[in-house]
Structures are given as C-alpha cells and as structure tokens.
C-alpha cells in the first residue's frame, strides 16, 4: 500500500512538471510568434518609408516641373530679397503669395556706365528664362542704392531714378520708359521698379535676353546704385509667375493614389483571430496618430540644389483604427460602420484605415541652372491631420 501511494505521488509530481513544461513551451512559442510578428511589422514600416521617399522624390520634382534632378556645380548666393521672401512664406502659414513661382535673375553684364555732369547712365543685360506653361504676373527690377557719406553733403539731397527698356530697330536705339521715382532718403536701401512690360515682351519673343537702362540724376555727387557682380547687392530682376499647367489636379490625383495605396496595404493584412487579442491589448499604444517623418535633403543627395529648407517634417499616419473611434481621428460614417462590423466579425470586414485627412503646404527655395527660385507648394507636402477612413 505504501509503495502504491509513493508511486502515485511520484506520478503526480512528474505530471505537474510535464504540464508546467508544456505550458512554458506554449508560452515561449507564443512569445516567439509575437516577436516574429513585430519584426514583420518593422520590416513593413521600413518598406513603407522607402516607398514614401521614392514617391516623395518623384512628386517633388513633378511639382517643381523638373524633368530630373538639377545638376548644379556650385552653390549660388540667393539675393537678400529672395531670402526674406522665403522666410516670410515658411514662417507664416497665413502669408499667401501673389504668385506661386518667384524667380530671381542677377544682372549678367554691365554693358557700360557713363557719368555726364549730374546724370549717370547704366546699361544692364539680363537673361530671363521662364517656361512657356507659366504666365508672368509681375516683374520687378530691384536696385540697391548707395549714398557716399564721405563726400561733401549737399544742401538739397535730391535723386531721381528712371528705368527704360532698350529696343533696337534698324540699328537705332529706342528707349521706352518703364518706371521711375524720386529718392530723398539718404540711407542705403533696396528700390523696386516695375519692368513687367519689358520682360513680357522678351518672354513672348522667346529671345529671353534684354537690356535695361537705368538713369540716375542727382543734385550732388554722393549717390549711385550697386552694380557689383560679386555679392547679393547686385541689380536683380524678380519674376512673379503662375503655373498654368495641371499641376494641382495632378498633385491631388497623386495624393488620392497614395491614400488608396495605404488602404490596400492595411487591407492586405488579413485579420487573424489569434492576433486580434494581442492587438486589442496594445490598442492604447498603437492607435491611429500622426508621427514624425523627417526628410533631410542632404541624406538623399539633394542639398546641392535645394537651398532651403535643409530638411522638413513630412509626417505620416501610423497605427490602427480600433473601436471605439474617437473624435480626434475624425472618423467618417463609413469608417464607424466598418469598425463595428469588424468588431463583431473580423473575417467579414477589415478595420478602417489610418490615413491623412488634411495636408499642408511648404515653401521651397532651390536653384536650377544658377537661377534661384522660391516656390509655394500647395496642400500636398506634409500631413497636418490623420483620421480613420
């Protein structure tokens, strides 16, 4: 009898050890499956990022109407006006530009400068190239005024500046007055003159290059304009234009394709019942949200032609649309119904997708063939809000 009891005790101990080992193996197997699943999710996230960067590069060039990446051999110093313009658009979301494309063309050559008494004439050569699919809205000639304080002061500081378009007809030079003004403030500053009419003629005639004559009349010999070709105070033509192509419609089509692609990626993840419990436990940490996705132009080899910004946060939408859908993810009615169906029968409907619901614009300053351009890219460049759809 004692032997039978002892045997039963040994058998119960062995059974408990075996049972605990089996449970431990089952737990290890579940943990292993969970780790493997997490690795697949991380690999999928990496593929999404690479896919996004590829899409972003193509879309970026298309928005700028560039057939390829500009091959710039040297950095160009942007004119001060272009720097200020970019900073205003980049820092103030409510600052709406009058044109979506602004280009600067620095004076190519000073053909001559002649001083006769109290009058000085400067003949300037500009080479302005604007794509045919853009419409010129306005053009400024910006001149930096120089007051020579070391020279004797005049009783009456008076200076007038007139700007002319130079036209040649049968070897005859004809001057057409474009703009002019009197300058009385004795400080070094930028003065802007309207030369829209002349540059439009250059553009429509497809010759691109044109000459502008600047005449300075002063009451004393203490005033001039900066014509240095070595720094960013040189004379510069600023062209404001609108892109008349179907860029905006095409951009929205691309965004819709991106949304569909994200939906397909989520939809391809078949809802498996044994994953559903683990996902539910992690719902609070993996809920639909906007996360950072920084694009550094140096990292992708674009810093030679992108002047500013050096990087920007495009953001992305990550996570899953778990029940209940809260107001902060602004769910559509269809997403709410789809989530309820998925909750009751995961095989019947996938979960709603976490996608961008609002996109914001950015301003970009870049150089192409030595020309500095500021472009305001509308509504398609970075995620502002995410939601369940």
Swiss-Prot record:
Pfam families reported in the protein's UniProt record: TGF_beta, TGFb_propeptide
Secreted among keywords: yes
Family matches, as SMART domains: TGFB
Region (Disordered): 263-284
Signal peptide: 1-20
Superkingdom assignment: Eukaryota
PTM characteristics: A reversible disulfide bond can be formed between the two subunits in the homodimer; this has no effect on gdf2 activity.
Positions of glycan attachment: 65, 118, 127, 232, 342
Record's compositionally biased regions (Basic residues): 274-284
Biased composition (Polar residues): 263-272
Compartments reported by the entry: Secreted
Propeptide residues, chain positions: 21-280
Gene Ontology biological-process annotations: angiogenesis; BMP signaling pathway
CDD domains referenced in this protein's UniProt entry, alphabetically: TGF_beta_BMP9
GO cellular component terms attached to this protein's record: extracellular space
GO molecular function, one term: growth factor activity
Disulfide bonds: 288-354, 317-386, 321-388
Disruption phenotype: Morpholino knockdown of the protein causes slight decreases in both anterior-posterior and dorsal-ventral axes, while trunk and tail anatomy are otherwise normal. Vascular patterning is relatively normal, although defects are detected in maturation of the caudal vein: the caudal venous plexus fails to resolve and both dorsal and ventral veins continue to carry blood flow.
Subunit structure and binding partners: Homodimer; disulfide-linked.
Known role: Potent circulating inhibitor of angiogenesis. Signals through the type I activin receptor ACVRL1 but not other Alks. Signaling through SMAD1 in endothelial cells requires TGF-beta coreceptor endoglin/eng.
Protein family: Belongs to the TGF-beta family.
Protein name as annotated: Growth/differentiation factor 2
Organism: Danio rerio (Zebrafish)
Name of the gene: gdf2
